[in-house]
Amino acid sequence: MAEQESALDFIEATHLWSQHAQFVGRAEGAPNPFRTIYGVEAQPGGVWDVMTRFHTICERLQLPFHVSTSVEVNPATGDMAVAFGAPEPTQFPTAVPDSHGRARDCTGKRAQWTAAYALRLAALRADIGFAVNTGIIGVTVIARAGEPDGQTLFSLGFNRVDFHFTTAKLFADGTIDDAQFDVDPAQLLAAFD
């Protein structure tokens, strides 16, 4: 029974995206402790400043999976590219308890859960990209199998204005946490537009 409860807690932990976005919002504009190292100060809003802000926020998020991320940025053009390692379907539980406490086989849902998780994570990475520097106007997010240099699963492009008026609202009102997207990740992707 403890294993079933643990699986259910895990599934619930994969639906806290609005809380993660709130954390990103609180971190936005915070001082960057890595901008000065050994007395050398990086340019505010420069490559080093933006990249260290991005990675600091990513590393401080409390996600159910460790996520390796790489980022490239060109502050002069406002472009950012992010690649992250998406979890594998085998990392999701094979069974969760139903309303009667009996284990329900969910092996067939793992691929959908993985896709929905990766899409939500891609949107959160874009949110972080826009939060670390107001000069970032476009974020391309690439989900890869397992590691940032793994096989490409998908790539999404976000621009600041559209993100603010569509995807950011999904975080703000909690819609992105809705379990309906777990059974139909394509519906979540459509909600980003």
Where does each model-flagged region fall?
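Long, charge-dense low-complexity segments
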Residues: 1-193
